[in-house]
UniProtKB/Swiss-Prot annotation:
Keywords: ATP-binding, Cytoplasm, Disulfide bond, Nucleotide-binding, RNA-binding, Transferase, tRNA processing, tRNA-binding. GO terms for cellular component: cytoplasm. It is found in: Cytoplasm. GO terms for biological process: tRNA wobble position uridine thiolation. InterPro entries: MnmA-like, MnmA-like_C, MnmA-like_central, MnmA-like_central_sf, Rossmann-like_a/b/a_fold. The record marks H133, Q345 as: Interaction with tRNA. Belongs to the MnmA/TRMU family. GO terms for molecular function: ATP binding; tRNA binding; tRNA-uridine 2-sulfurtransferase activity. The gene is mnmA. It holds the Pfam family tRNA_Me_trans. It comes from Natranaerobius thermophilus (strain ATCC BAA-1301 / DSM 18059 / JW/NM-WN-LF). This is tRNA-specific 2-thiouridylase MnmA. Catalyzes the 2-thiolation of uridine at the wobble position (U34) of tRNA, leading to the formation of s(2)U34.
Length: 368
């Protein structure tokens, strides 16, 4: 069946998705704009209506609608409250209660934007979805596969968040901004009088007011947030923590203990509700084991390959080797020890600008 040129653009009200919609319209696509209404706590609904900054606030809806009207495309607000809670919020809560540190944006991309949003697009008889992500998709005729690449603007590249996309999802996705710099995108918005050229990039967890995830967890699952011991690696008690959900690997501030030297969270023992602290050297690992693997250029990896990996959104890439580990897991071995490998975070594998794939960090391997 021939693909049509109708595309559903996820419009947050920000400059990137606004310009993406404009570009596609100018390229001859039949563009429909849509804003995703996500879940908030009842007490945060008023903040949703008042918040002028948030990517998912009512103000953002108004901005997206104004842009859609300006460029002359239909616009819908789609209700994703239930699936967002089921796939993103529940996972966020569960991961923290297990002593892990999740990245809800990766879960949102995987289960909401490229699962539920794609379903809505098909219901609207669209053959593509599009977003304002700074990444590129190329079809490789030799491999007969869609490939994902880092965007031209390496300071805004978002491929780390996209490494869970499948071949079926990549085939139905357009990234109009992949070959542009952020400054160019802002200039395009200004030249076309979209009214969003100067909007700042969103930094917060969209469903957590003020990015205070500790307060959020305390309010939604107070029965699971309990104080417990702070221990050293030998099991000696050094103090008491407020609840493991308030801490992450590598954290130094806010531990509430004074030992005459800096100490860091080096492990979280959720089974015993204990926080393990140690010196900075104890934060370093020689590798990690990743689960929930998705590979893009290959069906599977059979032998060790040289890669670079990214273990959190704002971290530098690390030269490594990648090899099978069994049970649908992969082993990453760093060429040099790496600090604060954090279970629950996403890990993305690269060769130059090509995204090999990604997964979720299960655990660090040998501490240095």
């Amino acid at each position: 069946m021939m693909m049509s040129n109708r595309v559903l653009v996820a419009m947050s009200g920000g400059v990137d998705s606004s310009v993406a919609a404009l570009m596609l319209k100018e390229q001859g696509y039949e563009v429909i704009g849509a804003h995703m209404r996500i879940w908030y706590r009842e007490e945060d609904e008023e903040l949703y209506e008042q918040n002028v900054k948030g990517c998912c606030s009512l103000a953002a809806v108004h901005d997206a609608k104004r842009v859609a009207d300006k460029i002359g495309i239909p616009f819908y607000v789609l209700n994703f409250k239930e699936p967002f809670y089921d796939w993103v919020v529940k996972n966020f809560i569960d991961e923290y209660l297990q002593g892990r540190t999740p990245n809800p944006c990766i879960a949102c991309n995987r289960f909401i934007k490229w699962e539920e949003f794609l379903k809505r697009a098909m219901a609207l008889e669209c053959d593509y979805i599009a977003t304002g992500h700074y990444s590129k998709i190329v079809y490789d005729n030799l491999k007969n596969r869609y490939l994902l690449y880092r965007g031209k603007d390496k300071t805004k590249d978002q491929s780390y968040m996209l490494s869970q996309l499948t071949q079926e999802q990549l085939a139905r996705t357009l990234f109009p901004l992949g070959d542009y710099y952020k400054e160019d995108v802002r200039n395009i918005a200004e030249q076309n009088e979209l009214g969003v050229a100067d909007k700042p990039d969103s930094q917060e967890i969209c469903f957590v007011p003020n990015n205070d995830y500790g307060e959020f967890l305390q309010s939604v699952v107070p029965e699971h947030i309990n104080p417990g011991p702070i221990l050293d690696a030998q099991g000696n008690k050094l103090g008491e923590h407020k609840g493991i959900a308030f801490y992450t690997i590598g954290q130094r501030r806010g531990l509430g203990i004074s030992l005459g030297r800096p100490v860091y969270v080096i492990d979280i023992d959720a089974d015993n509700n204990a926080l393990i602290v140690g010196d900075k050297e104890e934060l370093y690992s020689d590798g990690l084991i990743a689960e929930e693997i998705n590979l893009i250029p290959y069906e599977q990896i059979e032998n060790s390959i040289d890669i670079e990996c990214k273990i959190r959104y704002n971290s530098r890439n690390v030269s490594s080797t990648l090899q099978p580990y069994g049970n649908d897991q992969l082993l990453v071995k760093f060429n040099q020890p790496v600090e604060a490998v954090t279970p629950g975070q996403g890990v993305t594998f690269y060769q130059d600008d090509l995204v090999i794939g990604g997964g979720t960090i299960l655990k660090a391997t040998t501490k240095k």
